[in-house]
Amino acid sequence: MQRFIKWLAVITSLDLLIVLLGGALVTKTGSGQGCGKSWPLCNGEFVPSNLSMETIIELSHRLTSGSAGILVTLLCILSWKYYKHVRETKTLAILSFVFLVAQALMGAAAVVWGQMPAVLAIHFGISLISFASVILLTCLIFEIDQKFDARSLIMDKKMKFHIYGVTIYSYIVVYTGALVRHERASLACPDFPLCSKNRPMPTQLHEWVQMGHRVAAMLIFAWILYAMILAIRHYKQQPVVYWGWIISFILVTLQAVVGVLVVFTNASLAMALLHSLFISCLFAVLCYLVMLGTRIKVNAKEAGSTSKQTK
């Protein structure tokens, strides 16, 4: 059974990643109304008779979201049953399921009633939490933390602050990026790093949205760079922290490069999807560091109780 659960966890993680990228594809191609205003049917039909490209994209996104719902539910039930001895299992299972349902309902509401771009931008963030929760659940199932000897992890308050702070801030950056997509502001500023050679400062809403995201992205790049330097200097003996920040910096660098290429490739589809891919992976890595950070007090308590028993 455990082998089956491991396969299920991997397939579920991949399915949720496809859901995230599929949502970005729907937004990028303007396929949100590919099935009209009907849900769960498509243009009022179970199998649509008129298949335009927008319909195919929207319908595919709905099907992958539906399969993800089934897989996440099954994974939550089995992990709850067979891995309940791991303290984070129940919390992650609940988060995975609740946020997946929330993003599905929000997606349906957007189709039927429509939503403001500011509200639609939350949709990607909700999906991202579900994805990260499933990734962490998968890590627990594969006992990744034991391979890194996470029980002996030592971390000072400064490093924990950076882990929690960057993770929370990354979610804000994700929202600003999603807002850029939903406001159709990807090409509002045709130059980089300033908005335009003729007008370096933004003058209207779409330009402010675009430049706001750029500033937020530059700040997270600098923050992760600083945290990585700290990890390299002081955490070489803690591989999970050391490599966690190095991987995070690689991902945020790729994210930044692709973000610039989005501007200079006229917001090509490939760059837009890579932009969503890298931020999804980065958020998952940061959430894993958060999970380990929450264990520090537990590890300390366990060590304290053990020493008392020894005395």
Swiss-Prot record:
According to its UniProt record, this protein's enzyme class is oxidoreductase
Q: Which molecular-function annotation in GO is an example for this chain? A: metal ion binding
The residue spans the entry assigns to the Cytoplasmic side of the membrane are as follows 1-6, 84-91, 143-159, 233-243, 293-311
Q: Does the keyword Endoplasmic reticulum apply?
A: no
- Quickly give the catalysed reaction: Fe(II)-heme o + 2 A + H2O = Fe(II)-heme a + 2 AH2
**Organism superkingdom:** Bacteria
Q: Which residues bind heme o?
A: H61, H123
Q: Which residues form the signal peptide?
A: none
Q: Record-annotated residues binding heme b?
A: H213, H275
Q: Tell me the route in metabolism or biology where this protein functions.
A: Porphyrin-containing compound metabolism; heme A biosynthesis; heme A from heme O: step 1/1
Q: Which UniProt keywords apply?
A: Cell membrane, Disulfide bond, Heme biosynthesis, Iron, Membrane, Metal-binding, Oxidoreductase, Transmembrane, Transmembrane helix
For this protein, the Enzyme Commission number is 1.17.99.9
Q: Cite the Pfam families for this sequence.
A: COX15-CtaA
* Compartments (UniProt record): Cell membrane
Q: What does this protein do?
A: Catalyzes the conversion of heme O to heme A by two successive hydroxylations of the methyl group at C8. The first hydroxylation forms heme I, the second hydroxylation results in an unstable dihydroxymethyl group, which spontaneously dehydrates, resulting in the formyl group of heme A.
Question: Into which family does the record put it?
Answer: Belongs to the COX15/CtaA family. Type 1 subfamily.
Q: What is known of its domains?
A: The N-half (TM1-TM4) and C-half (TM5-TM8) domains are connected by an intracellular loop. Each domain is formed from four-helix bundles and they align in a pseudo twofold symmetry manner. The N-half domain is the substrate-heme O binding domain and the C-half domain is the cofactor heme B binding domain.
> What's this protein's name?
Heme A synthase
